[in-house]
Amino acid sequence: MSTPHINANPGDFAKTIIMSGDPLRAKLIAETYLEDVKEVTNVRGILGFTGKYKSKDISIMGHGMGAPSASIYFHELMATYGVKNFIRVGSCGAISDNIHLKDLIVAMGASTDSKINRIRFLDHDLAAIANYDLLQACIEVLKTTTVNYKVGNVFSSDLFYRPNENDYTLMAKYGVLGVEMEVNALYALAAEHQCRALALCTVTDHIVQHEHLTADERRTDLHEMVKVALETAIKI
């Protein structure tokens, strides 16, 4: 049975999915790393695929930009298609002096300026946190690599172009490592639907220091994150 935004058939999705904001990146990941790949959904250009990685069924799918868009796909995958394990791979802007370009942030929790979780949670603040089993599995994988990584909190913003950059000073004071747009929604929906979720963010920009990766560097270093996500996926 399809949903308004996903036209896959029952059973088309694996229990574990890796999600990216960019549907073309999802397509690239699927075609590069999976065997026996099948496209399972393509509504509104949001592409989803299922295949095998080291003999384990894995799905890859896009979700668009921002919490409202991403929440549609997270919800439908959880509520209708029975997907249980979510690993989001994406980029972020660093705000901490201890974080550098190309570092990988493993998002332990997500603060936000969005009201999306308050709407779900009786206008209370929800602690939007990663699943511990996924987090632990990811750290085990990272310890076998040369990837520079930090584990900590991110800030999920509704604004890509923030009008007051002084906000970042306060966030950094509270230990926030980087800013992105979807993690708080993913972790809240995973809690609501008793699923497991983890987000990985490669630092492609340093907001405070005004540093940016080139297009070629983004392509290469995001692949390192994807490999970590895939190896994490087969450990759970």
Swiss-Prot record:
Reactions it catalyzes: a purine D-ribonucleoside + phosphate = a purine nucleobase + alpha-D-ribose 1-phosphate; a purine 2'-deoxy-D-ribonucleoside + phosphate = a purine nucleobase + 2-deoxy-alpha-D-ribose 1-phosphate
Q: Which GO terms describe its molecular function?
A: purine-nucleoside phosphorylase activity
Q: Which residues form the active site?
A: D205 (proton donor)
**Which positions are annotated as binding phosphate?**
G21, R25, R44, R88, V89, G90, S91
Q: Which GO terms describe its cellular component?
A: cytosol
Identify the keywords attached in UniProt to this record, alphabetized. Answer: Glycosyltransferase, Transferase
Q: Which residues bind a purine D-ribonucleoside?
A: H5, E180, M181, E182, T204, D205
Q: Which EC main class describes this enzyme?
A: transferase
- Where along the sequence does the record put site: Important for catalytic activity? R218
Which processes are annotated in GO (biological process)?
purine nucleoside catabolic process
What SUPFAM superfamilies does its record include?
Purine and uridine phosphorylases
EC numbers listed for it are 2.4.2.1
Q: Which cysteines are joined by disulfide bonds?
A: none
Q: Give the quaternary structure.
A: Homohexamer; trimer of homodimers.
> Which family is this sequence assigned to?
Belongs to the PNP/UDP phosphorylase family.
Which purpose does this protein serve, as stated in its record?
Catalyzes the reversible phosphorolytic breakdown of the N-glycosidic bond in the beta-(deoxy)ribonucleoside molecules, with the formation of the corresponding free purine bases and pentose-1-phosphate.
Q: What is the official name of this protein in its record?
A: Purine nucleoside phosphorylase DeoD-type 1
- Per the UniProt entry, what species is this protein from, by scientific name? Shewanella oneidensis (strain ATCC 700550 / JCM 31522 / CIP 106686 / LMG 19005 / NCIMB 14063 / MR-1)
